[in-house]
Swiss-Prot record:
It is found in: Nucleus. Keywords: Activator, Developmental protein, DNA-binding, Homeobox, Nucleus, Transcription, Transcription regulation. It comes from Drosophila funebris (Fruit fly). This is Homeotic protein ultrabithorax. Residues 176-189 have a biased composition (Gly residues). Residues 125-141 have a biased composition (Low complexity). The keyword Oxidoreductase does not apply.
């Protein structure tokens, strides 16, 4: 019987396999035949990923791929020292000329975007800027009047979220401030934008991104009543009570 495993180039790839099995099938069970047959089945220690038919003496040497050089060059262009033009981020906010993320809404004095909710007319610096800084055009980079830091609008994408639209000026109103009806100019917000918070004077203070949100009055009472319904009490029935045979009327025994 010549099966796949009894061939010279069989699965185990041992040269003594065919001769050992052929002699064994003829009835010549001498010591040499037994040794050859045993050696044939001891030679199966080939790795699983290696083919016994491959010529391992003519293996291809390792070569550098032409794509490796292009990948290295691209990485150096982006992350290397020579690629400084690709390193624009929020840490490079100095002026519009070098700011890779130019804020198109909050850069002008009359377009809003001062540190506290609108640049106003840019004539009274610390009155319409909201951050008590004389530079109305750079208000988004100045700290608030109350010592509270204000996020740069270039790193604040929520200042351009749809829905916060100033219908009078046509520009989105930032979360930092601006009157809900006046669009963050000096007077339409209700009061001049030089409040103690320095974030959003007048009506805009409630919509500031870092304003403290508290619930009081009827809303607080309604919230407390709703939360009390979820508090566990003596009448609460848990699934383990049914498993243990507890009664819902008297869960504590």
């Amino acid at each position: 019987m010549n099966s796949y495993f009894e061939q010279a180039s069989g699965f185990y790839g041992h040269p003594h396999q065919a001769s050992g099995m052929a002699m064994g099938s003829g009835g010549h069970h001498d010591q040499t035949t037994a040794s050859a047959a045993a050696a044939a089945y001891r030679g199966f220690t080939l790795p699983l990923g290696m083919s016994p038919y491959a010529n391992h003496h003519l293996q291809r040497t390792t070569q550098d791929s032409p794509y490796d050089a292009s990948i290295t060059a691209a990485c150096n262009k982006i992350y290397g020292d020579a690629g400084s033009a690709y390193k624009q981020d929020c840490l490079n906010i100095k002026a519009d000329a070098v700011n890779g993320y130019k804020d198109i809404w909050n850069t002008g004095g009359a377009n809003g975007g001062g540190g506290g909710g609108g640049g106003g007319a840019a004539t009274a610096g610390n009155t319409s800027n909201g951050s008590n800084a004389p530079n109305a055009a750079n208000g988004q980079n100045n700290a608030g009047g109350g010592g509270m830091p204000v996020r740069p609008s270039a790193c604040t994408p929520d200042s351009r979220v749809g829905g916060y639209l100033d219908t009078s000026g046509g520009s989105p109103v930032s979360h930092r401030g601006g009157g809900s009806a006046g669009g963050g100019n000096g007077t339409a917000g209700g009061v001049p934008q030089n409040s103690a918070s320095g974030v959003g004077g007048g009506v805009g203070a409630g919509t500031a991104w870092n304003a403290n949100c508290t619930i009081s009055g009827a809303a607080a009472a309604q919230t407390a009543a709703a939360s009390s319904l979820h508090q566990p009490g003596n009448h609460t029935f848990y699934p383990w009570m049914a498993i243990a045979g507890e009664s819902t009327a008297d869960p504590i025994k």
